[in-house]
Amino acid sequence: MNKRSHPFASRPPVLALFQKRIDGDDALLHLASLRFKDCGLGTEFYSETPEELEKLLMFRPSTETPAAVHLKRGLDLFESGSPGMVLEFAERFRDRIFGMIIHDQTEVISHFDGYVSVLRKIDADLKSLGGSPYLFIEYAAGIEPESFTDLLKAIADLDHVSACIDIGHIGLRHIRDTFARVHNGKDIFSIKSIDPEVQDAAGEIQMAVGSALDGVLQVIEKLGRLGKPIHFHLHDGHPLAQAGAFGISDHLSFLDKIPIPFEYRGRRHLDPMFGPSGLSRLVRKSLRLLGPERTSFSLEIHPTGGRLPLGDVSFLFHHWVDKGNAERMNFWLSVLCENQKLVLKSCEKGELSEAARKDDHL
């Protein structure tokens, strides 16, 4: 089994999305750089071309903090130029990033052997570079989680290709399957918070939502046993959280609650899939199985409509007449830092429990 580790072995690196995602000029990236540096966050860039990544790396808070890049979402490894694109990123940035993330594909099901063969060829090419970053295959196409774990088992011997476990994607898939099993195939994502049936079905919805944590823990258990480095995309979600800026049900903060137009158990909100306690269990489980040297976390939380005064960074936006988007960016960055604290606290708990376990064996 491959035991190769990333270069941040003393503590698992914690990264976050490093993007604008809010309209404005490069002052927003300067703001992100300052806030990431203050928090000690690593950077996960989204880049479709090497030239785009070169520009983004100019805003990297520090060369000492870990960095990874998420390649374009529609990358199809069966297209002739795609493996070469992966190799180009690896060769050009191998001294500046430790990982590259791409989405999995539905062909994992329909062309399993062919997909594995492509990954084996990519792994051989990455190995020939020397010092190549990892290629992490993210669970994103919505296939059966069992098929995803089968894929990783089939490439367990590869040195440079491993998994990106997106806990939000896997959690939502588990919720959908759980709800459908007990409701004659009904899709929980067809329900909206304003629907009349929601109030009566709230208990059953939350029962399905509460099952997501165990579903993700099972995937971590299976893949963790392979002994390969794993990258994690961390974010929360809920089937009724469909009114966000991107119209999706996940990429929420672990501190978010889901507002509802009625009272449920004395509150006018629902809990998301994980929350801080679920996140803590996921982080500690990962560290127990993998150790910090084979674990990396990235907060993939999207912006909300909140605003936060610019304060000490207002000088970056003197040329802006309307500071609204700058304040929205500042708020989003504060959310990332708050969630980073949750992850780091969970890591500390994991370290303490591991130390206690070792003491028990002395």
List where the protein language model places each region:
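Catalytic cores of phosphodiester-bond-cleaving enzymes
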Residues: 114-140
